Regions:
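Short helix-perturbing small/polar motifs within transmembrane alpha-helices
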Residues: 25-64, 69-172, 193-264, 268-318
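Sensory-domain boundary/capping and coupling elements
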Residues: 320-325
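Ligand/cofactor-recognition surfaces for anionic moieties
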Residues: 2, 23
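Alpha-helical transmembrane segments that form the membrane-embedded catalytic/substrate-binding core
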Residues: 119, 123, 176, 180-192
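Acidic, Ala/Val/Gly-enriched low-complexity intrinsically disordered segments
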Residues: 7, 18-21
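Acidic, low-complexity intrinsically disordered regions
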Residues: 1, 62, 174-177
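Polybasic, lysine-rich low-complexity intrinsically disordered segments
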Residues: 10-11
């Protein structure tokens, strides 16, 4: 006689769990009616794009480093579709200005802006189609969708179009331009998009509110240790020790999850990239130009990303499941 009651309780529990899981799995998309928001978006994009063009146009064509599209992708992936035109227009204008002032000049401004927007749109549309729960870094499957959209679709198309423009306007060959675009934009997308998404979704603030002082102290200590190891490897060591940062990187992935892993990748990209461009670090042993060494460094960072972020995403999925029990 008690079974119906138990079934009812079980059904109620399952519905409650499903509701909780749905709430956890579907972050609320941002929406703002402020006119200041697209202006701020465009200004951030312009500053990041201009710095990339000033610092990393080693061969007179494309920038070898590019992180501004990661900002646009994060904006699109965390906002409602009706807010996309504002961000797209703002970033398109910013891209055109940066190219005109610091890149290949006014003739390339419009086509390069269109290609930058196309890349971000492809990633956003593919992820919105195949990751309906909006939790892009929440599991290995959703992370794989993002990686395939960025590396296998968007930048194959965008690199081809950009290389055609560069080959017509400069002396840089189609093949070299294609590789410069692909490596620079893939590295920028992999490095910065996940942490920007977590920040824009409020996950960073939520982590600070929910975690205790002990956890925060551990996070600071581990990231400081990782930064110190990275500085030693890229600035002071005279031996090829590129494998050394991988151990603390994996440890951070297990202890701090996706937030810590994303922060560590940014630290690695920032310190290692600055050292490589400045002529320091183990990559100076490679023959070739600064551009060649930068591309090799981008490959190294991409492999580091693929080593730690899927692990962090899988652990994050398990934590959510245990939290529902």
């Amino acid at each position: 006689t008690h079974f119906p009651c138990r079934e009812s309780q079980k059904s109620h529990f399952c519905q409650s769990s499903a509701s909780t899981d749905s709430h956890m799995q579907r972050p609320v998309l941002r929406h703002t009616s402020s006119l200041f928001a697209p202006i701020l978006t465009g200004c951030v994009y312009f500053v990041v794009a201009s710095l990339a063009l000033i610092m990393s146009r080693f061969e007179g064509g494309l920038a070898f480093l590019w992180g501004s599209n990661a900002f646009l992708m994060a904006q699109l992936l965390t906002s409602r579709t009706r807010a996309w035109p504002q961000a797209i227009i703002a970033c398109g204008i910013a891209s055109g200005l940066a190219t005109s002032l610091f890149g290949m000049g006014p003739l390339a401004a419009m086509p390069m802006a269109a290609i930058n927007i196309l890349e971000a749109l492809i990633v956003a549309m593919v992820c919105r189609r195949f990751v309906p729960d909006r939790q892009l870094t929440g599991s290995t499957r959703t992370l794989a969708v993002f990686i395939i959209a960025l590396c296998g679709v968007a930048n194959v198309v965008a690199a081809t179009l950009a290389a055609m423009v560069v080959a017509n306007l400069t002396s840089v060959s189609f093949g070299a331009s294609w590789l410069q675009w692909y490596t620079g934009h893939v590295l920028g997308g992999l490095t910065f998009t996940p942490i920007l998404i977590l920040f824009l979704q409020g996950e960073l603030g939520k982590w600070f509110r929910d975690s205790g002082p002990r956890v925060q102290l551990e996070a600071v200590a581990l990231l400081a240790l990782f930064a110190a190891v990275t500085v030693h490897v890229f600035c002071f060591s005279h031996s090829p020790l590129l494998f050394v940062p991988l151990l603390p990187l994996v440890l951070i992935s297990f202890r701090l999850g996706q937030m810590g892993a994303a922060a560590a990748i940014i630290i690695l990209a920032g310190i290692g990239g600055a050292a490589t461009i400045s002529g320091f670090g183990p990559l100076t042993m490679l023959p070739g130009s600064t551009g060649v060494r930068t591309q090799f460094f981008q490959f190294y960072v991409a492999l580091s990303f693929l080593l730690c972020m899927p692990v962090a995403a899988a652990l994050n999925g398990r934590r959510r499941l245990f939290g529902m029990l």
